[in-house]
């Protein structure tokens, strides 16, 4: 029953008080089970059917799907339950205690993005779900901040095909219809160690990496010349060399060298296409030095994403907000949800607050976010 729900601010407070950090380091990584239980209980109180889905390959992480109504189509509202780790020395407030000051709600996950679920629950107080003509789905995912395992697994296993979806990431209520992807690789070269007094007796991995980097930089230039998407502020795929390490002493021939790099592909470029371009670029080195160069993923790749600009979802949201859709450079779960249905990224709070000490959401977003959620439910589930 709706009267069982706590007030909006208490829902928000409970979400922030329930830690659900995602991290690649096992010591920092936390299960989101308690947060999923909170959400599941609240949606059950509203009469929703709730399914909790364990996510394989994670450390006790779960997705939750709350649904009301049956039949084809409908609306999916989605978000992730996890947060990034926090630097205790840089926060001036308790990250797990919601505090309000000067028109801002402070706490880890206030903007990115536990707060979105508080907005959904509060908006549903004013929606008579018994009158829905199409189903309404609420998806809460795991591990967006690391592997995006929750969204990947849900998209791979669900039979749902809603009419459209909105992911409530912090966009300052500016609708986003496209973003670049992210591929991060480790280039590793295995040389042969030896004393520096006789270089011919070894294979210097740093020298081989120098050769490889030349080919990678040529790929970077080719990407800039061949691919264009003018809506982006950086209108081509970027390639960055971010980290390199090799050798251990000035008088030893370097046996190992490792380079970390990333590519941010634009929408429409497939992951297979990018892997092929990288392998082709490195082929001269691999052919000259067989078995010494390997390419490994640092994390599962994220493709670029785009919602068709002429889709009904774009038209409806632009009309409701009086704002045109945008494209952004950061990544979300949208590429995976987009495999199910046309998807927009749209939510309260600023992306500039994401992953920052003293993260906050401005209270000016409360009323318009609540109204927007009610409006999109009415449009896509009542008509």
Swiss-Prot record:
Primary location recorded for the protein, binned into one broad class: cytoplasm
Family: Belongs to the peptidase M20A family. ArgE subfamily.
Listed GO CC annotations: cytoplasm
Active site residues of this protein: 82, 144
Source organism (scientific name): Shigella flexneri serotype 5b (strain 8401)
Cofactor comment text: Binds 2 Zn(2+) or Co(2+) ions per subunit.
Enzyme class: hydrolase
Catalytic activity of the protein: N(2)-acetyl-L-ornithine + H2O = L-ornithine + acetate
GO biological process assignments: L-arginine biosynthetic process
Lineage: Bacteria, Pseudomonadati, Pseudomonadota, Gammaproteobacteria, Enterobacterales
Any matching Pfam family: Peptidase_M20
Protein residues bound to Zn(2+) 2: 112, 145, 355
The protein's required cofactors: Zn(2+); Co(2+); glutathione
Annotated EC: 3.5.1.16
GO MF term (any one): acetylornithine deacetylase activity
Subunit field text: Homodimer.
Cross-referenced InterPro entries: AcOrn-deacetyl (IPR010169), ArgE/DapE_CS (IPR001261), Bact_exopeptidase_dim_dom (IPR036264), Peptidase_M20 (IPR002933), Peptidase_M20_dimer (IPR011650), Peptidase_M20A (IPR050072)
Function: Catalyzes the hydrolysis of the amide bond of N(2)-acetylated L-amino acids. Cleaves the acetyl group from N-acetyl-L-ornithine to form L-ornithine, an intermediate in L-arginine biosynthesis pathway, and a branchpoint in the synthesis of polyamines.
Protein name: Acetylornithine deacetylase
Top-level taxon of the source organism: Bacteria
Database matches in Gene3D superfamilies: 3.30.70.360, Zn peptidases
Compartments reported by the entry: Cytoplasm
UniProt binding sites for Zn(2+) 1: 80, 112, 169
Pathway: Amino-acid biosynthesis; L-arginine biosynthesis; L-ornithine from N(2)-acetyl-L-ornithine (linear): step 1/1
Keywords: Amino-acid biosynthesis, Arginine biosynthesis, Cobalt, Cytoplasm, Hydrolase, Metal-binding, Zinc
